[in-house]
């Protein structure tokens, strides 16, 4: 169970950020911010609901992944959680509550979404969320929707994690490792991609939609497809290589772990490559320093991958020639990592300031997702790769 004090400190930090955001945007000091978790949606032409995922700015305040929930922030007032619990015999509408987080919020229970109107001063409220048409139909067109300077400010601040957030991410990583161990064991036993995937879910005790992203479970040649989306069910007793990219979510915060395993019977050059890549990853982690730019880590990664390719006689060219010709990018077309938090690819990886100034990925590696200067309390991944 998370610490009640850590969560209270987290909420206090959010209150400070949101009050500063209102001042930054130059709106009235009496303004409120209404954050919507989102609404349930359905597949086109069908009555089957798409698995719901709450808006991350809502989850920042409330660890409840349910549709049509609202957090109302007003400076000087305790944050109000407008908890909509419909009367419904078709679905379980229970919202699990625990005092470690409920004690920091003023919870107002409502039966219908329409009931939120009595708590909203529309003329002085800024709405954050996806359902602009729905919320303006309910509260009026004068409601400010997704004010760009406000989103820029809040997105930028999301890169800096509180102690509570870091604690959730630590747990998410520890839980994912249990699943990765089970997946590795299943691979050694000759299970199929589908079987390995199920072993991961079972070990983590989660359903597919509860994971922070869709698991990638790739055997042999399919491991060369970066976002391989299938789960083959055929016999895999002779498979030599497993790549698994899978995480775990805790109170909205997700881990992101990619591992590659090779059997003893795999090609010796590949096994050597794998061992060296694991060493390379550790070296990259050791190189992280506050004040450096994340793009420097990526450039160092490309240099190290290139040197390794030359060392193993996979590429025959000098380091300088390889980098100029962008040969390492043929083997590592992705970025070395990204910010991590309420979204696996967390927001504001390119954002350089509160105003929303963007620094795009360098032309030599357009897939890089983070160009921020490294600062304390940031959480990001370091995940070099070498794909064939």
Positions of the model-derived regions?
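Active-site neighborhoods and metal-handling regions in enzymes and metal-associated proteins
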Residues: 1-388
């Amino acid at each position: 169970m998370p610490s009640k004090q850590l969560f209270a400190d987290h909420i206090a930090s959010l209150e400070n950020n949101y009050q500063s955001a209102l001042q930054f945007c130059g709106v009235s000091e009496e303004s409120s911010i209404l954050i919507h978790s989102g609404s349930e949606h359905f597949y086109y032409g069908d009555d089957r609901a798409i698995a719901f995922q709450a808006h991350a700015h809502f989850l920042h305040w409330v660890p409840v992944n349910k549709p049509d929930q609202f957090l109302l922030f007003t400076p000087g007032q305790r944050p109000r959680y407008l908890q909509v619990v419909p009367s419904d015999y078709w679905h379980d509408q229970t919202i699990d509550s625990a005092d470690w987080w409920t004690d920091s919020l003023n919870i107002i229970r409502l039966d219908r979404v329409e009931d939120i109107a009595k708590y909203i001063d529309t003329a002085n409220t800024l709405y954050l969320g996806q359902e602009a048409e729905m919320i303006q139909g309910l509260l009026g067109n004068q409601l400010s929707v997704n004010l760009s300077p406000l989103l820029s400010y809040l997105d930028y601040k999301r890169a800096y994690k509180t102690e509570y957030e870091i604690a959730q991410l630590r747990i998410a990583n520890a839980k994912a490792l249990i699943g990765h161990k089970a997946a590795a064991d299943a691979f050694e036993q000759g299970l199929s991609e589908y079987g390995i995937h199920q072993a991961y879910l079972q070990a983590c005790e989660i359903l597919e939609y509860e994971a922070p992203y869709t698991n990638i479970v790739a055997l042999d040649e399919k491991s060369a497809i970066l976002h391989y989306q299938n789960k083959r069910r055929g016999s895999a007793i002779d498979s030599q290589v497993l790549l698994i990219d899978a995480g775990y979510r805790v109170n909205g915060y997700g881990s992101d772990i990619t591992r590659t395993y090779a059997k003893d019977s795999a090609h010796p050059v590949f096994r050597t490559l794998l061992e060296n890549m694991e060493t390379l990853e550790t070296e990259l982690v050791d190189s992280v320093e506050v004040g450096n730019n994340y793009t420097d880590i990526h450039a160092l990664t490309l240099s190290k991958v290139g040197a390794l390719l030359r060392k193993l006689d996979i590429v025959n060219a000098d380091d300088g020639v390889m980098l100029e010709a962008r040969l390492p990018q043929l083997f590592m077309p992705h970025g070395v990592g990204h910010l991590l938090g309420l979204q696996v690819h967390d927001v504001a990886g390119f954002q350089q300031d509160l105003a929303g100034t963007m620094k795009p990925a360098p032309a030599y590696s357009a897939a890089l997702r983070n160009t921020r200067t490294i600062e304390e309390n940031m959480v990001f991944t370091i995940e070099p790769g070498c794909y064939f």
